[in-house]
Amino acid sequence: MKIENKLKEMGLELPTATPAPAGRAGAVQVGNILFVGGHTPGSAHQGKLGDDFTVEQGYEAARQACLNCLADIKATIGDLDNVKQVVKLFCMVNCTPDFGQQPQVANGATDLLSELYGDSGAHARSAVGMSALPNGASIEIEMILEIN
């Protein structure tokens, strides 16, 4: 089944890719590797985990940030079915110093990629806490993909 059809079946909508500021790109292809720059979940998810958001809300924010990554992936390579393997996911979590559940938050993105791509969605991952992220975002995600 096509990835975009899976998204619809899951009740999820692929957002429109947001143009990157001048001099940058949302994603850059080098050979068969696609580097996806940092994506946040949007203005509805501004704040800190451990203070403004629960782990469950962070999970949903990571899922939304991943959807925003997928929008730029589609804009760059034309079709989400051209992803051969998700190689690496880097999830940055804006959190309080005592918050230690970054992996559980990052699972929002990991689970989505697994649901969409199956074994090809399995990836190496880092989930780290940050004292701040751009524009107060709760989550920022970067990805590296192998494409067909």
What residue ranges belong to the model's regions?
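Short, polar/acidic, helix-capping and beta-turn segments at strand->helix junctions
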Residues: 1-148
